Amino acid sequence: MHRSIAFLPLIALLACSPQSGTMHATEDQPTAAAGMIEDYTQTPVHIWEAEPERQSLGQLAYRGGLHIEHTDERFGGWSALEIDQDGTRLLAVSDSAYWMSAQLEWSDNGWLSGIEGIEITPLLGREGQELVGDEEDSEAIAHLGGSRYAVSFERNHRINGYDLGADHSGIHDAVGIALRLPPGAVDLPNNGGLEGMTAFDGDNILIGREYPPQDGAPYLLYYYDGQDWSDVRVASLPGFAVTSLTRYGDHIYMLERFYTQEDGTRIRIVRFPLESLAAGSLIEAELLGALEAANPVDNFEGISVIEHNGETTIVIVSDDNYNAYGNQRSLFLAFALED
């Protein structure tokens, strides 16, 4: 299948390269193998592990969580998350350049109850090739509208665009198209690149670098308003980093992560008004909830916000680093924002 590019009005972000004209593998390009995974386990988790009846977390009300386990070496490392606005279809990318497409199941009272139909597919490069080595570290997804998505990568810092087709039907052979990086992004640290990304209002895109220029300094986000790039500064706490961004309604939602060997992992879910992007002043984000030692805390790197069961529902996913350290999990947690 051969398709012409359809990223308008984000066409201004397209890199000028002769390879940038198709979004699906042609007959001369290999189509990578994909596969449904079966026999995985789903274990419910409590938000307060020592107090199973407790459901509140700051301004958030818990709406269920799952620990997903599978022996397939492709499963894990989930670093970004997008959920359709009806709350049923999930799309994720991993540190090893795989897509995951799946269906979310919810109980009648709005609790996350299961993940079914998990399919894992290689995420392809700009020549239709499978990605390996420093090319494979996919970190963020932004939904560009329709069936089009952008994916950011670190180590070899770049952004690719993909057309996945209706209901992700073209995910198996979607070829990356080069999108233009924000100014200076190519010089970011090897393992500290474009960690969060969200697109909105047709031609606006917001991208977050993982670490502030100096510890405790404001986070630096790159904002494209349809015409120009500008820097956005968001106040940070010492030791924290940006791991994900998403827009919902009139707010930007952001995940922050803290980790040291001595103190372990902490996660903050925050938000700030969309209109503050154009203000030019330092943004002070609103803390919605924080995960610490008493909670099922892990390396959460993906966030998506939807309207579900009449509530603003936040879903986060953790990157278990393929459990290389023996104590990490692939967790999917859901929360409702309490008014």
Q: For each of these PLM feature ranges, what is it?
A:
Residues 16-339:
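Sequence/structural signature of beta-propeller domains
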